Amino acid sequence: MANDYFFTSESVSEGHPDKVADQISDSILDAILAQDPTARVAAETLCNTGLVVLAGEITTNANVDYIQVARNTLREIGYDNTDYGIDYKGCAVLVAYDKQSPDIAQGVDKAHDDGLDQGAGDQGLMFGYACDETAELMPLPIHLSHRLVERQSQLRRDGRLNWLRPDAKSQVTLRYVDGKPDSIDTVVLSTQHDEDISLEKLREAVIEEIIKPVLPKHLIKGAINFLVNPTGRFVIGGPQGDCGLTGRKIIVDTYGGAAPHGGGAFSGKDPSKVDRSAAYAGRYVAKNVVAAGLASKCLIQISYAIGVAKPTSVMVSAFGTGKIVDEKIAQLVSEHFDLRPKGIVKMLNLLRPIYKKTAAYGHFGREEPEFSWEQTDKAAALRAAAGL
């Protein structure tokens, strides 16, 4: 990639139909883990006009009212009015869960004496990434995109812009010079709204109250192209506007396209699924490498075979920014991080009901107390081991 370029990332609000599905799936996962931390959960959700469908594979001793969990999640998001196309009180909720396949379970359940050789729940490849563009060590375009839709939600919830509805999308284009963020070029924000708000009033309020407070002043170096509700109308939204499905916002969930993605979604999956747990571990590794000053950006790829605990491969790239060679960073990673599935669960304390909070506004780059994968507690040891 050239040193001078434009790069774009997007995010969506908690009321976006795919994020509604993600939050229902993770709310169900949390409700199960609260009673049965070793449950096997793969909870998928579909939501459409007036309808929620819950399907997947769950093996648990927990007693959970899945229908009520789904309704509560819709209520918390703000779908409490039939005008919005789905109302938590009156929507239909269908439940169709099976148990985990015994063929899969036999590969995951086996463990040796130390209990840490539990096999991976599936084959696959996962990526972790960090860079020094923000204090949170995240790419700036996805960071700003998340903050925009978070602010839309905040102003909707506190009533300052009481004509806002739950569904919204953001998109930020930055200009990079010498590989670093230089200026903001374009901001797109589309937000669902009540029928009686004029487009002129909406655009002015969105730019002044939502967008401008989020943008870093040092990146405003000329006229920014603001595109607010460019279709002119966004009354019909949420699950009524589009059918929502779990796992369809995997780039929003991660790095906004700034790093590769292995393809596996997160929400609704318990930590035995390496799609989720190994991606969290990859973020933990990459963030600690950058926090340690070993590199200004770091990408890690981890791969697994089903039923096998040890990763089939681990790759580290610092994109030429490393203070030491990539092979040495990879060696330090293997010495300081246990990337077996059960080792990850133990290292990051993942058998907790912490996942609903991850299901909107990004799984990474948020300083939430539950997000153990955002800690930089290994940075000092890595730096010392590297001799820096």
Curated annotation (Swiss-Prot):
InterPro entries: ADOMET_SYNTHASE_CS, S-AdoMet_synt_C, S-AdoMet_synt_central, S-AdoMet_synt_N, S-AdoMet_synthetase, S-AdoMet_synthetase_sfam. Mg(2+) binds at D18. GO terms for molecular function: ATP binding; magnesium ion binding; methionine adenosyltransferase activity. GO terms for biological process: one-carbon metabolic process; S-adenosylmethionine biosynthetic process. CDD domains: S-AdoMet_synt. Pathway: Amino-acid biosynthesis; S-adenosyl-L-methionine biosynthesis; S-adenosyl-L-methionine from L-methionine: step 1/1. K(+) binds at E44. Residues 100-110 are annotated as: Flexible loop. It catalyses: L-methionine + ATP + H2O = S-adenosyl-L-methionine + phosphate + diphosphate. SUPFAM superfamilies: S-adenosylmethionine synthetase. Pfam families: S-AdoMet_synt_C, S-AdoMet_synt_M, S-AdoMet_synt_N. Catalyzes the formation of S-adenosylmethionine (AdoMet) from methionine and ATP. The overall synthetic reaction is composed of two sequential steps, AdoMet formation and the subsequent tripolyphosphate hydrolysis which occurs prior to release of AdoMet from the enzyme. This is S-adenosylmethionine synthase. It comes from Polynucleobacter necessarius subsp. necessarius (strain STIR1). The lineage of its organism: Bacteria, Pseudomonadati, Pseudomonadota, Betaproteobacteria, Burkholderiales. The gene is metK.
